[in-house]
A protein has these predicted regions:
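Aromatic/acidic polysaccharide-binding cleft in carbohydrate-active enzymes
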Residues: 1-103, 110
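Acidic, Ser/Thr/Pro-rich beta/coil linker or hinge segments at domain junctions
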Residues: 136-183
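Generic detection of short hydrophobic beta-strand segments and adjacent strand-loop junctions
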Residues: 85-93, 127-131, 165, 169-175, ...
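Short beta-strand-to-coil "C-cap" segments at the C-terminal boundary of structured domains/repeats
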Residues: 191-199
Length: 208
């Protein structure tokens, strides 16, 4: 749960021009269901004390594991361009408390590759998002999608299952037109649409 809302917050940090590393990126002692910062493992790295560990001296055995929130940082670090691109939804569903379920942030890098970060905060419903890139024909471009999604909003990494929640990546596909992205309930994805590579002209029959 916490990872999805961290993703929403970090996207707003970027939109405002603020370094998202200012969002806390801390380690903390692991305890079931919560840590010192609050419920649902607020810190992105959890530290597990061994039986011989001394937290005062730092001596003894300690192990570490990443929370889903850490993967949000990793996805943004590896899937983001330097220039923000305007995004808008034709319609945004809301939850019972009035909060919007969908968020998007798009960017381009220096090579012209497009990155679209999408959040579906709805805990009950998947959403299909039809991407329309204004002024760009993406047919023939290559697309990859990184996903952070689970079957349950209470899913978490633990010392026993440190990789229960992790990032998956779909196989690269060649687009035939504007893609439709399936956003699972309570998920975060980053879509990368690579700039089409212009084929080199065949000069084999050119005469001097």
């Amino acid at each position: 749960t916490h990872a999805i809302y961290i993703a929403k917050v970090l996207m707003e940090y970027v939109r405002m021009g603020s370094p998202y590393i200012q969002k806390h990126c801390l380690s903390d002692w692991y305890s079931d269901g919560k840590d010192s910062l609050g419920p649902t493992q607020q810190a992105v790295i959890q530290v597990v004390k061994g039986a011989d560990a001394n937290t005062t001296t730092g001596e003894g055995t300690f192990t570490f594991f990443s929370t889903p929130s850490a993967y949000v940082f990793k996805m943004l670090n590896s899937g983001f361009g330097d220039n923000i691109v305007k995004t808008e939804f034709s319609e945004v569903p809301t939850m019972a408390n009035g909060a919007e379920t969908l968020s998007a942030l798009a960017s381009k890098d220096a090579e012209g590759n497009l990155y679209i970060a999408l959040v579906n905060a709805d805990s009950d419903r998947d959403r299909n998002i039809a991407l329309q890139i204004e002024g760009t024909d993406v047919a023939g471009n290559k697309m990859t999608i990184q996903k952070l999604e689970t079957d349950s909003i209470t899913a978490a990494n633990t010392p026993e299952e440190p990789t229960a929640v992790q990032v998956t990546e779909d196989a690269e596909v060649e687009l035939e037109g504007n893609p439709i992205i399936n956003l699972k309930k309570h998920s975060f994805v980053i879509v990368r649409i690579a700039k089409a590579v212009e084929p080199e002209a065949d000069k084999s029959e050119l005469q001097a």
